[in-house]
Each structure stands twice: as structure tokens, then as C-alpha cells.
Amino acid sequence: MPQLDTSTWLTMILSMFLTLFIIFQLKVSKHNFYHNPELTPTKMLKQNTPWETKWTKIYLPLLLPL
């Protein structure tokens, strides 16, 4: 059974990392970032729900007299 030649693996792995790094740098450099991000104020509208307008009384079963 022949031996596996691993002498070129280091070169291949290093070249792969270099290529991936270059591709990633090119993709990030073409991305448009916001220069000055600011929070936009949002208005919270108060909506009345039916259970807020009605008076309700909740009875727990354990509090009822026997």
C-alpha cells in the first residue's frame, strides 16, 4: 500500500486561508456602512383593549367558600 504524500498539504492549506482572507476583505470593503447611525424615535400608540375598559373580577377556585 503506497504512502500518502502530505508534503503539499501545508502549501494548499495556507493558500486556501490566504485566498479566503482576500475574498472576505474584498467583500467587506465593498459593503456600505452607515456613517452616523442614529436612533429614530417611534411613537407608541396606546390602544384600549376590551379588558381595560371593563371592570372584571377574577375568582380563584381555591378562594371560594365551601
Swiss-Prot record:
Organism: Bos taurus
Keyword RNA-binding: no
PANTHER family recorded: ATP SYNTHASE PROTEIN 8
UniProt record similarity statement: Belongs to the ATPase protein 8 family.
InterPro entries: ATP8_mammal, ATP8_metazoa
Protein name: ATP synthase F(0) complex subunit 8
Chain positions with N-formylmethionine modification: 1
Gene Ontology BP annotations: proton motive force-driven mitochondrial ATP synthesis
GO CC, one annotated term: mitochondrion
Alphabetic keyword roster: Acetylation, ATP synthesis, CF(0), Formylation, Hydrogen ion transport, Ion transport, Membrane, Mitochondrion, Transmembrane, Transmembrane helix, Transport
A molecular function (GO) term: proton-transporting ATP synthase activity, rotational mechanism
UniProt topology in membrane: Single-pass membrane protein
Modified residues (N6-acetyllysine): 54, 57
Subunit composition and interactions: Component of the ATP synthase complex composed at least of ATP5F1A/subunit alpha, ATP5F1B/subunit beta, ATP5MC1/subunit c (homooctomer), MT-ATP6/subunit a, MT-ATP8/subunit 8, ATP5ME/subunit e, ATP5MF/subunit f, ATP5MG/subunit g, ATP5MK/subunit k, ATP5MJ/subunit j, ATP5F1C/subunit gamma, ATP5F1D/subunit delta, ATP5F1E/subunit epsilon, ATP5PF/subunit F6, ATP5PB/subunit b, ATP5PD/subunit d, ATP5PO/subunit OSCP.
Subcellular location: Mitochondrion membrane
Role this protein plays: Subunit 8, of the mitochondrial membrane ATP synthase complex (F(1)F(0) ATP synthase or Complex V) that produces ATP from ADP in the presence of a proton gradient across the membrane which is generated by electron transport complexes of the respiratory chain. ATP synthase complex consist of a soluble F(1) head domain - the catalytic core - and a membrane F(1) domain - the membrane proton channel. These two domains are linked by a central stalk rotating inside the F(1) region and a stationary peripheral stalk.
Transmembrane segments: 8-24
